Amino acid sequence: MNNKILEQLEFNKVKELLLPYLKTEQSQEELLELEPMTEASKIEKSFNEISDMEQIFVEHHSFGIVSLSSISESLKRLELSADLNIQELLAIKKVLQSSSDMIHFYSDLDNVSFQSLDRLFENLEQFPNLQGSFQAINDGGFLEHFASPELERIRRQLTNSERRVRQILQDMLKEKAELLSENLIASRSGRSVLPVKNTYRNRISGVVHDISSSGSTVYIEPRAVVTLNEEITQLRADERHEEGRILHAFSDLLRPHVATIRNNAWILGHLDFVRAKYLFMSDNKATIPKISNDSTLALINVRHPLLSNPVANDLHFDHDLTAIVITGPNTGGKTIMLKTLGLAQLMGQSGLPVLADKGSKIAVFNNIFADIGDEQSIEQSLSTFSSHMTHIVSILNEADHNSLVLFDELGAGTDPQEGASLAMAILEHLRLSHIKTMATTHYPELKAYGIETNFVENASMEFDAETLSPTYRFMQGVPGRSNAFEIASRLGLAPFIVKQAKQMTDSDSDVNRIIEQLEAQTLETRRRLDHIKEVEQENLKFNRAVKKLYNEFSHERDKELEKIYQEAQEIVDMALNESDTILKKLNDKSQLKPHEIIDAKAQIKKLAPQVDLSKNKVLNKAKKIKAARAPRIGDDIIVTSYGQRGTLTSQLKDGRWEAQVGIIKMTLTHDEFTLVRVQEEQKVKNKQINVVKKADSSGPRARLDLRGKRYEEAMQELDHFIDQALLNNMGQVDIIHGIGTGVIREGVTKYLRRHKHVKHFAYAPQNAGGSGATIVTLG
């Protein structure tokens, strides 16, 4: 399609209306490149995507997508074997996380039936291993300590050295206060210094790094911290080097996946663009038009998108209709109507909602041409008429039966009689070529052409004779008429002059009366249609209200089910806590062994009645709610014992999970981690923040280290450890005894062999300690 029409109708300004709805740079780039399409299938696909998005908002009320920066240049740099900086890696991390969120969102969707968006969601890929590694980059664009063991070591040393320097300088601040111009530790060239009065500069030995502008203060690095500061400088250099190495490693991790990540980024941007189209449609009461296959146009209550308070009009351009000629005086809105048609077509063919009512229909044109406004070329010294005619000649040479042509004031700028004849000849040529045309004119001769010629229809813009102002209402089928006599009378022209003028135009009076009658009939028809539309709107509101009530009822029902489940869980927890309290009191007041308490606890559990709840519909529904929170590949987690964030990468056959935590892979059971998403939901509900930082050292340990212990001490600790593990229902524990002389190892083996609650034990794998550690299964 020719680009000139986009400029003439200010299509770029229409595209700017969607900018506030976009969240990603990728979608902004897509909007910038948006142009009208000429294939009906592609347009239909765009409309189907908006319909799918509408389903999401109707059923789920939102479609969350985070702000994402463009990563296209970063991916190109990766393809050129370049390493990315921390900000580029952070942008890619957000794309990976957003991809995972979208996959989970799609898997949780209910009550929707997509036509197009399902393919987009299904083409998204997630990278749990990469996501786990990228947990080492926080949202502030900073590498966490656990990014690598070396980085953690360097930063720990750096912190210790800086603390020692501060302590030494703090002591000197107290001891040498009278020698200092300020009681503070300053920094010069990255080294910690003291601000010493110039008169006492020889009282503190060290390196002078700076002098104040007045010369009264000398910034000295005391000799006591010179070595430490040099160590800090070296550690900072080591830190930068290690960070660079880590960034290089991250870049290498990404390189094999560039194409897939690029596709993910495009899909996320496109989903954001579709979301913006829907929100634009919703806010502006626009609609998704139907696509005709026979060049039929039907725009119901169509509005100009760039006007603040546009008047809605109906426009019908049937298949057989070739031309619509809008006649009547200037300033009535003829040009606006012309542009409204053109913009509605451009928006529709670009896959955008059209500012019209439901039931509207657009055609698909290969080209749209327009001659609108004064396009006189000053450089070529062309007159207005010559400029327009040059443009019209170009249009007639290029237009075909798949084109739409728009003419504003066709034939203007020359002798009225010749101009009218030219206008009719041009329209006749286009009619015979089956080219759809809309033209405005103020020549009365074209009214007769519209009445007498097949497949050509007159139209006009309504004028209010009472207020002497245009209403901007489009009246299709009614030719325009002059309102000169009415206006002159209302403005005070003598009645006899007006009467004489009417007598001079007797030949036209009958035509004007017919036009007046047509206008009255059109207004009556419009009033009836408006009433019908009001009834339709009331019905639509009623249907929406019913659907809203149903959704609210479903939501409240689900809340009640959740509440019932929580109350049942609380009852069970209270009973278990009460039994634990009883056992604790027994333990405190008697000489019972811990394993005897375990036996007693098992007997208490046997006392609980076994109730068959398999047919309980309420609890079954509650179980489904709980099951919805089961972990999935790609979920972000917190490893409870370490307080570290990671990502689930796969599930083993025995039910355990593999997780990527920084650069480390871990194997975890379900109770050794918590889902970040679930934690965040609980934080919102409880209005408090509980972040696991470190396992409580006073609680039961899953690992016992006996290295360096005496035999008797080791056996006592082992006995206590096993009892505590059994009390806390631990299924598996690790005992580290080392190899050494083998005395403690043999003692551990004998103890485990005779303990009735030890189901199985064996040495650890070679990569986990070998014969220096024993893995024990309890039961």
From Swiss-Prot:
Gene Ontology terms describing biological process: mismatch repair; negative regulation of DNA recombination; rescue of stalled ribosome
Cited SMART domains: MUTSac, MUTSd, SMR
Keyword rRNA-binding appears in the UniProt entry: yes
The keyword ATP-binding belongs to this UniProt entry's keyword annotation: yes
Pfam families in alphabetical order: MSSS, MutS_V, Smr
Binding, ATP: 328-335
Origin: domain of life: Bacteria
Class of enzymatic activity (EC top level): hydrolase
Smr domain location: 704-779
Keywords carried by this UniProt record: ATP-binding, DNA-binding, Endonuclease, Hydrolase, Nuclease, Nucleotide-binding, RNA-binding, rRNA-binding
InterPro entries with a match to the protein in the record: DNA_mismatch_repair_MutS_C (IPR000432), DNA_mismatch_repair_MutS_core (IPR007696), DNA_mismatch_repair_MutS_sf (IPR036187), MSSS (IPR046893), MutS (IPR045076), MutS2 (IPR005747), P-loop_NTPase (IPR027417), Smr_dom (IPR002625)
GO molecular function: ATP binding; ATP hydrolysis activity; ATP-dependent DNA damage sensor activity; endonuclease activity; mismatched DNA binding; ribosomal large subunit binding; rRNA binding
EC identifiers of the protein: 3.1.-.-, 3.6.4.-
Similarity comment: Belongs to the DNA mismatch repair MutS family. MutS2 subfamily.
UniProt function note: Endonuclease that is involved in the suppression of homologous recombination and thus may have a key role in the control of bacterial genetic diversity. Acts as a ribosome collision sensor, splitting the ribosome into its 2 subunits. Detects stalled/collided 70S ribosomes which it binds and splits by an ATP-hydrolysis driven conformational change. Acts upstream of the ribosome quality control system (RQC), a ribosome-associated complex that mediates the extraction of incompletely synthesized nascent chains from stalled ribosomes and their subsequent degradation. Probably generates substrates for RQC.
Subunit structure and binding partners: Homodimer. Binds to stalled ribosomes, contacting rRNA.
The protein, known as: Endonuclease MutS2
Gene designation: mutS2
